[in-house]
Amino acid sequence: MSIAQNKKAFHDYFIEEKYEAGIVLEGWEVKAIRAGRVQLKEAYIVIRRGELFLIGCHISPLPTASTHVNPDPVKTRKLLLHAFQIKELIGKVERAGYTLVPLDMHYKAGKIKLEIGLAKGKKQYDKRESEKRKEWERDKQRLLRMRHS
């Protein structure tokens, strides 16, 4: 079940491969995510010292958050993957000019997971081409429905 999606990533990037990663979260963050108070729109992933980190993911604390905890909505969060996956991603990002983007936050066996995509940036004309293709598919479906009615 999806919690939050980053639809803008599919508009701005060609997604080559997808990986599923765990996230290191605090208790108040888990509660806020379960309440749907998370946003991936401005988020991105960086590599530091051989580890992956999610930056810019906004998790709004619940008003009932504890007073002894100082919640930071946009703090850097560590991502958890197997070592061989991290090495593979680092190699592709450093050599081939790829970038890592968060695509979807979802539940898997009661745990919160983040789907990340190995992506290559789209140029402006690629974005326009994708938009035209989507529009044509919509028009084609509309014409087929009208013909069969």
Curated annotation (Swiss-Prot):
A Gene Ontology BP annotation from the UniProt entry: trans-translation
InterPro entries, A to Z:
SmpB, SsrA-bd_prot, SsrA-bd_prot_CS
Signal peptide coordinates? none
> Superkingdom of the source?
Bacteria
Alphabetized GO MF terms: RNA binding
What role is this protein assigned?
A: Required for rescue of stalled ribosomes mediated by trans-translation. Binds to transfer-messenger RNA (tmRNA), required for stable association of tmRNA with ribosomes. tmRNA and SmpB together mimic tRNA shape, replacing the anticodon stem-loop with SmpB. tmRNA is encoded by the ssrA gene; the 2 termini fold to resemble tRNA(Ala) and it encodes a 'tag peptide', a short internal open reading frame. During trans-translation Ala-aminoacylated tmRNA acts like a tRNA, entering the A-site of stalled ribosomes, displacing the stalled mRNA.
Its name, as the record gives it, is SsrA-binding protein
Q: Which gene encodes it?
A: smpB
